[in-house]
Amino acid sequence: MLKVEPIPAFQDNYIWAIHDGHSAAVVDPGEAAPVEQFLAQRGLALGAIVITHHHGDHQGGVSDLLARHPSGPNGEPLPVIGPQGERIGHRTQAVREGDTVTLRHPAVTFRVLDVPGHTAGHVAYVGDLPGAGPVVFCGDTLFASGCGRLFEGTPAQMLASLDKLAALPGDTRVYCAHEYTRSNVRFAQAVEPANPDLAAWAARVDILREAGTPTVPTTVAHERAVNPFLRSRESTVRQAVRAQGGDVSGDAAAFGALRGWKDGFR
């Protein structure tokens, strides 16, 4: 049986730890110290490092972790998995869509999806974990009620990436890498103020955050219901974008206008 737990880092990052009570794989360790503390508190060995994209707040802790854990639980070199199309330090396995990642400590298998947009070579890892069920680790592509900024990709690329994630089974748990939900929900409500699912979710987010509790993971089905970036083809979203002066002449144009609105939203 596997557990997935968040390791808070920086101001709003989540490093995800997948563990079996003995060893852990960590996803997007932007800094090492919180990971070391988590491992020590739970008596876990570090078994693998998994990276979704090249930004420093997702891989900045790899060097320090390898200095402390050069080998895995059985003495083999510690695996560092990362996207083929990006600059990933210390990477031992480069992956792209269609590849399978098989970890030993803990025993985990992922299939890889290419999800460019936030960065050019961003990937996501999809699996069905014993005890945790279907999961996707999606870095900064899909957030709870939002999506990542387009630093390197185009609106068409990001829309295609989000379509790919939205097509996963509805009960897939979405493990994103930031606690941006409150601000994302404020924007989503500006886009779809009459969405009842969103209203209920906004109230829930306030309760969770006031208690200091993460709002993630959510599920793919939940995101389809409340996330404007998965709903950019809906008439309500198109009307809101048009009211802001956005171009809704096509799917990519409407998505780009929606993303541009969010970029300037306060």
Swiss-Prot record:
Alphabetized GO MF terms: hydroxyacylglutathione hydrolase activity; metal ion binding
Cofactor(s) the record lists: Zn(2+)
Involved pathway(s): Secondary metabolite metabolism; methylglyoxal degradation; (R)-lactate from methylglyoxal: step 2/2
Binding site residues for Zn(2+) 2: D57, H58, D140, H178
Residue stretches in coiled coil: none
NCBIfam families membership: GSH_gloB
Subunit description: Monomer.
PANTHER family: HYDROXYACYLGLUTATHIONE HYDROLASE, HYDROXYACYLGLUTATHIONE HYDROLASE GLOB
Name used for this protein in its record: Hydroxyacylglutathione hydrolase
Organism: Cupriavidus metallidurans (strain ATCC 43123 / DSM 2839 / NBRC 102507 / CH34) (Ralstonia metallidurans)
